[in-house]
């Protein structure tokens, strides 16, 4: 490269391509950021719009992939040597730390997208050395190409690692589609530094259940809890309390938590045999010559035993490449005392351990070292509930292995969705309650007869549309839970949610259940089809003959198929589409709207057209009139947008997040509005969409676009026909 410009002015333009460029959100940080609705489109995806991974992966030679992974486990590489000549522990940690970011509160995180390849996860302090694990997998990814996503490979590698060390797998499903840039919708925490004290995300760090929602990890940059103890201060009882809350927020109960802790720490080791301060920067901060690697270790010198990751040093068991009962044998067979690792981290070591019980050195089989336990491990012994579970496991090793295999499957498949989405020969046939099973619904009924009965039922357009919406809006694309299939709006806890207006809902469901009994259609299908009836009726009243697309075949779930406590997390605390929120929150109503729209898989234009349609259809919660900018309520018109953009009106705040829309000449109040309504006129991007639908030539376009977006929402969870 020429040095002509050395010392002179920069020869390229500053601005769009500069890392110093200040974008809109820098200048106006309080502005509504719509970016979470504009993620993962075809412009960032090198595979193109026509590529369908879930079809492509079905062509994969599943057995050949597993054979290659088994071979990889013991093929130690000089550039990153394997502990005891086996990469199993490293691969399990990689899989675990991918899947373990899942949290049940919003369904985000998890291993379903291959996001560990990108910031911030690729550079989290808890993910030190996982860059090496993924690079070890590259030859396999390269070989199988488009038929095997990174997301599937990362999770499969951990499962095969367990198999290679003696644990039969409960099963595995393919079907995880890769993303191509970091997610913008996941809130990892508000801290400004890695591993900031836990106090920053707890109301009271002494009370683990006061952790900020929807977070699950105790510190920024950790997957679960601090292995040294709460804020790096060892106290197994306190750590056990954090473990319980953290794993519960990741959808695990006490038995699953104990099984995962024990099974996860039966194999592999912690790495802290050196100075953590000597490590180079994380991948995102490393120089270009590192080629995506981070945490370079000048003291590695080709020996696995010299690695530094967590700072804790040592294996948990006598045979770290074998899945056995060694974890329990050592944890409960010895007394333990606090020590410091070579890297200065707190760890527990055994008192007077027999030499033959000590694990071999990871690089030199002529040496043995003390095993270690983290503070979380000691909680399994000292917390009474966890201890009782562990004692049950010790008394029945086969039960422990089965519990762990099932918990591992749940951990790695929780965000993949229902069983209908499973792909591959090892997908288990058993129905598991956490999969939210739904029985197949009938398609052997006359759709038109159902529609006629709904139309003659005396229900209003608002009742029909609102009930269908409430049933479908629970869908979360984050973990593929919720939605209209199953009609769980009939069951606890959904039937009693404030946002579902229980009294109205009960009245409507009685009508639908009767129609279901008379026609053979499932209640789930009747709910959705009734929404179609309401929309078609409203469109006809506005002068448009339309037919809302409909797919038969939804089933009706039962209470026995429903894990009611886990569905509590799907309860809406706000729904801008129905102009409702449960109470006042620090987060603005329009931001809550964006969050729900993103979980439902909506784009900004789809969100916009749905708001406009829902308002004129009179679907506001409790029948309020906020945002009903029309004199023709019940007709599917573009009046919401026409009147929102009409400069004949002014907008005056009247308190509690509400506004009056006044005639500029008479100062008379014409309508009322919420912040959610007015943001479609105030935000420049949303206003641009609102103006499209307000145009004189776009009345019909509005109706068509509303129906298309509505149909998308109703079918979001139809994995039985998508798979």
UniProtKB/Swiss-Prot annotation:
Keyword Oxidoreductase part of the UniProt annotation: yes
Textual note on the cofactor: Binds 1 heme b (iron(II)-protoporphyrin IX) group per dimer.
Enzyme Commission number: 1.11.1.21
Tryptophyl-tyrosyl-methioninium (Trp-Tyr) (with M-250) cross-link, renumbered residues: 96-224
Pfam families referenced in this protein's UniProt entry, alphabetically: peroxidase
Highest taxon above the source species: Bacteria
Gene Ontology biological-process entries: cellular response to hydrogen peroxide; hydrogen peroxide catabolic process
Annotated site residues (Transition state stabilizer) in this chain: 93
General function of this protein: Bifunctional enzyme with both catalase and broad-spectrum peroxidase activity.
Family matches, as HAMAP family: Catal_peroxid
Oligomer status and interactors: Homodimer or homotetramer.
Entry protein name: Catalase-peroxidase
Native source organism of the sequence: Marinobacter nauticus (strain ATCC 700491 / DSM 11845 / VT8)
Upper lineage: Bacteria, Pseudomonadati, Pseudomonadota, Gammaproteobacteria, Pseudomonadales
The gene coding this protein: katG
């Amino acid at each position: 490269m020429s040095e002509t410009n050395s010392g002179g002015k920069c020869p390229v333009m500053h601005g769009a391509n500069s890392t110093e460029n200040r974008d809109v959100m820098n200048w106006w940080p309080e502005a509504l950021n719509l970016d979470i609705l504009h993620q993962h489109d075809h412009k960032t995806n090198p595979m193109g719009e026509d590529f369908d991974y879930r079809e492509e992966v079905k062509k994969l030679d599943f057995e050949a992939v597993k054979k290659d992974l088994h071979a990889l486990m013991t093929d130690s590489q000089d550039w990153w040597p394997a502990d005891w000549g086996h990469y199993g522990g490293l691969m399990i940690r990689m899989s675990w730390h991918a899947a373990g970011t899942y949290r049940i509160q919003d369904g985000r995180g998890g291993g379903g997208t291959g996001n560990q390849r990108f910031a911030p996860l690729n550079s989290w302090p808890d993910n030190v050395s996982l860059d090496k694990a993924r690079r070890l997998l590259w030859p396999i990814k390269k070989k199988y190409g488009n038929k095997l996503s990174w997301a599937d490979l990362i999770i499969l590698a951990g499962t095969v690692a367990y198999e290679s060390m003696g644990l039969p797998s409960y099963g595995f499903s393919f079907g995880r589609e890769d993303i191509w840039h970091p997610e913008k919708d996941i809130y990892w925490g508000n801290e400004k530094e890695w591993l900031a004290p836990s106090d920053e995300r707890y109301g009271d760090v002494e009370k683990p259940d006061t952790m900020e929602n929807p977070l699950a990890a105790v510190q920024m940059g950790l997957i679960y809890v601090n292995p040294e103890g709460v804020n790096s201060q060892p106290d197994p009882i306190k750590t056990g309390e954090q473990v319980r809350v953290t794993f519960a927020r990741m959808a695990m109960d006490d038995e699953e938590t104990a099984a995962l802790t024990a099974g996860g720490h039966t194999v592999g080791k912690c790495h802290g045999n050196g100075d953590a301060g000597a490590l180079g920067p994380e991948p995102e901060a490393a120089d270009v010559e590192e080629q995506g690697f981070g945490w370079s270790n000048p003291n590695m010198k080709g020996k696995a035993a010299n690695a530094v990751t967590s700072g804790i040093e040592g294996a948990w068991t006598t045979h770290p490449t074998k899945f056995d009962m060694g974890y329990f044998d050592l944890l409960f067979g010895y007394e333990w005392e606090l020590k410091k690792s070579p890297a200065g981290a707190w760890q527990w070591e055994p008192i007077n351990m027999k030499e033959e019980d000590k694990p071999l050195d990871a690089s030199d089989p002529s040496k043995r070292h003390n095993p270690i336990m983290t503070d979380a491990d000691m909680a399994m012994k000292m917390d009474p509930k966890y201890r009782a579970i562990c004692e049950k496991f010790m008394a029945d090793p086969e039960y422990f292995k089965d519990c762990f295999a099932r918990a591992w499957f749940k951990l790695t498949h929780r965000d993949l969705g229902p069983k209908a989405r499973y792909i591959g020969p090892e997908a288990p046939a058993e129905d598991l309650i956490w999969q939210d099973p739904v029985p197949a619904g009938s398609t052997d009924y006359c759709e038109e007869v159902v529609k006629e009965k709904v139309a003659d039922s005396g229900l209003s357009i608002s009742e029909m549309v609102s009930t269908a919406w409430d049933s479908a809006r629970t869908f979360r694309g984050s973990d593929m839970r919720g939605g209209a299939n199953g009609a769980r709006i009939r069951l606890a806890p959904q039937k009693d949610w404030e946002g579902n207006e229980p009294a109205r809902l009960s009245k409507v469901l009685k009508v639908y259940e009767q129609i279901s009994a008379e026609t053979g259609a499932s209640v789930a299908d009747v709910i959705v089809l009734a929404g179609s009836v309401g929309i078609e009726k409203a469109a006809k009243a506005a002068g448009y003959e339309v037919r809302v697309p409909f797919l038969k075949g939804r089933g009706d779930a039962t209470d026995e198929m429903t894990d009611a406590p886990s569905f509590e997390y799907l309860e809406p605390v706000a729904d801008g589409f129905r102009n409702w929120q449960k109470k006042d929150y620090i987060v603005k109503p329009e931001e809550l709207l964006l969050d729900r729209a993103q979980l439902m898989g909506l784009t900004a234009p789809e969100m916009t057209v749905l708001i406009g349609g829902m308002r004129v259809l009179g679907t506001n919660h409790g029948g309020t009139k906020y945002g009903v900018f029309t004199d023709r309520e019940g007709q599917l018109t573009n009046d919401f947008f026409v009147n929102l953009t009409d400069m004949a009106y002014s907008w005056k705040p009247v308190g509690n997040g509400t506004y009056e829309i006044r005639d500029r000449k008479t100062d008379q109040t014409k309508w009322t509005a919420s912040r959610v309504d007015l943001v479609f006129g105030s935000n420049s991007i949303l206003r641009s969409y609102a103006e499209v639908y307000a145009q004189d030539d776009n009345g019909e376009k509005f109706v068509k676009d509303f129906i298309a977006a509505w149909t998308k929402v109703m079918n979001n969870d139809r994995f039985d026909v998508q798979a």
